[in-house]
Amino acid sequence: MKLHKTPFFPIITEQTFKYSKKYVLSMGSSSSVCVGIDDVAIHFPRLYMDMKDFADLRGEDYGKLNKGLGLKAMSIPDVHEDTATMGANAVMKLIDRNGLNPRNIGRMYLGTESALDGAKPTATYIVDMLTQRYSERYGLDCFRNCDVVDMTFACIGAVDAMHNTLDWAARSTDDDERIGIVIFSDNAKYALESAGEYTQGAGGGAILIRRNPRLLEIPDIIGVSTTPVHDFFKPRREVSVKSIISNVMTLAQEAGQSIKKGIVERMIRHLPASTVRKLGIFAHGEEKVSVHRDEPVFDGQFSNRCYQQAVRQAFHNFRQKAERSGRYNHADDERFTEQWSRIIMHLPYAYQAKRMFPDVFRHDREDTDMWAEVAENLGPAPEPHNSEDPVIIEIWEKAMDGYRRAISKTPQYIDFHASRIEKGQRASSLIGNQYTGSIFLALMSTFESDLEENVNLDNMLFGLCGYGSGAKAKVFEGKVSPRWREVVSRWHLFERLAGRVAIDHITYENLHKGLQSGSVVEPEGEFALIEITESGVQEGARRYKWIDA
């Protein structure tokens, strides 16, 4: 694919101003408060694994991973890093860069699917670290009146947290400006040698939400699609104590130990009187042990189809709401995806948007001359069916997959992708999946790429498409502030990515399995996990500390 070699400068026409006027009207009356994203900070691990090394480790085709999926590297958390530290480090960057007084931050809502506790919000661990950092200057109670909570809906949790916080910030007044921070933080970890292993990544971020934002104004028009499915989930697994003991005995036998017949049953009967009955997995006296794993149960192909369907349906819902609000007139206005100078999407891997967006591209243009030209070359889309026969459904789905691929190879779509979507995938190629943060990483990647290429984005419209397995999609839009350069110029995203430390496959697998005894790179100038209490009434409590540079 050939990309533009010269800077692309959007032309501000009379039509553009018409959209801008409608955009303002969609916000409500003239007394409404304009709210949105004022700044974004991101923190990612200093460790990464080069995709060439990963391909060698797993015997994969690097060309397929790189050229086919857009993968170059994956971020890997060190021993002292977790969801809380990555989130806290990002919030600290945001506070320091913007000179915020913690006492003026009214809420910090965390979107994550990598929570560290089943009851205690991970956001409270983040507040604990931030209090350590800022208490000397602002007092031990500097975050006492800050509302915090975790929000979970797979990869769309941080988008949900942002929309919730936007509603709250919109109630700001001149006497009471509401300042909120939305946090995203996740470790996208998959089982070793699984089909999703090469899409791993990690990182945290913080989004400053307030009125009159310097980066992106977001109106209150949100398209939503929710369908309960099992495309990707992290269930609580249950394992019987008997099966655990039986597996240990089998392992001992395979290691050369002589095991007496019936020993497992005798051990189970003896357990209530045993000296180990109050230790470890036996402590609760239950027949089954609940096990949580960070690695998901997933069906990649099915999840892709859920993603395509949900985003298409959410886009349709967004367009309906925009028409009702007066923001959009389908008969007269240019199509939405043409109005949007950039399209920001959730990227579980870098080229996901390139592969998934053809549905919306077609749906938004079906009654246009341009689509008539495309359809003349491709032929009509496969006819929808009403069958409940799984064989017929699968045949139709495969036919639709082929039609989407055909759309993605047309000159019209290639140009569309290059000008509107491609810049968002550049940082994703270097980090991997960030779950809740992937859409915001794409946003940062787009802005910084346009800044480096001296593109004028002032007052341009962005379309944003979030997705979370389970499944839900949201489609909304934003208007770029003329002040965006002063914000983006302080990010240095790609410069920081270039300064990371590569690890070999032994270190990678040791970190993944929890066998790495100490930090690969000692923490400095960051928050770090220093202890997890192992017993007593504080069992499982996590302790963190700021480590000076």
Task: Write out the residue ranges for each language-model feature.
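Acidic, glycine-rich active-site loops and adjacent beta-strand->loop/helix elements
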Residues: H43, G111-D117, T152-A158, I183-K189, ...
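Short, positively charged and aromatic/hydrophobic N-terminal segments
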Residues: I11, K18-Y23
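Conserved catalytic cysteine-centered active-site region
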Residues: Y62-T85, A115-I181, D364-S438
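Conserved beta-ketoacyl condensing-enzyme motif
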Residues: I37, T83-V159, Y328-D359, I393
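C-terminal catalytic subdomain
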Residues: I392-Y403, A418-R490, F494
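Flexible, glycine-rich active-site loops centered on histidine and acidic residues
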Residues: D175-I207, N212-P213
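Short, well-ordered amphipathic alpha-helical segments that serve as non-catalytic structural scaffolds
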Residues: D61, A84-N98, Y307-N329, A442-T446, ...
